[in-house]
A protein has these predicted regions:
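Hydrophobic alpha-helical segments and their boundary regions
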Residues: 8-11, 99
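A generic "folded-domain core" signal
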Residues: 25-176
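N-terminal secretory signal peptides that target proteins for export/translocation
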Residues: 1-6
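Bacterial N-terminal signal peptides
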Residues: 10-21
């Protein structure tokens, strides 16, 4: 049986902080870059007075089938929200609405993780596997996300994991 974590306010907060979903209104909403570590960066912010820290990366490559389908930028982030007792939540914003009632997959080497999808976001379906996924990400070279859009377009995004461990360590230290 899978344990599904239904996303809270983290995705809209992070998107707003990055300027992807409208302007952030308060100064605390603006993320502070804690450090850039190769392909990953660490950030912190305090929207609504609640501290949020996260490691963030863009894909190194993106493909669609059929080829050339337009979409918004994709991002992967791992967030820690102490006020919500959330630590190392893996999230993906894929840049298009996923096909309803479908899962995405995240692959690190030969290890696959099912991802629950909602609108343009994906989260690990079985929360009990999240620590194992983080450990695989820390040890891996890249992570591939595969999903299907509401229009049936298949996508494959490859994220480099170079710098992830350092960015994650920095974000975790900031949000102790």
């Amino acid at each position: 049986m899978s344990a599904i974590r239904f996303p809270g306010a983290a995705v809209p907060v992070v998107l707003a902080m990055l300027g992807l979903a409208g302007a952030a209104t308060a100064q605390g909403d603006q993320p502070t870059l804690l450090g850039q570590y190769s392909d990953w960066a660490a950030y912190a912010a305090s929207p609504g007075g609640k501290k949020v820290c996260f490691a963030l990366a863009k894909p190194k490559s993106s493909q669609t089938n059929p080829p050339g389908r337009p979409r918004d930028p994709a991002y992967m982030f791992i967030s820690t929200r102490p006020a919500e007792n959330v630590r190392n939540e893996v999230s993906i914003i894929i840049g298009y609405p996923f096909k309803p009632s479908t899962d995405a997959t995240a692959e690190i080497g030969a290890t696959k993780f099912a991802m629950y999808t909602q609108n343009d976001g994906a989260w690990i379906k079985n929360v009990a596997e999240e620590a194992r996924m983080i450990e695989a990400m820390r040890k891996g070279a890249d992570l591939t996300v595969k999903g299907v859009s509401g229009r049936g377009t298949q996508s494959t995004d490859q994220f480099s994991l170079k710098g992830l461990a350092q960015a994650l360590d920095r974000a975790e230290a900031e949000c102790k």
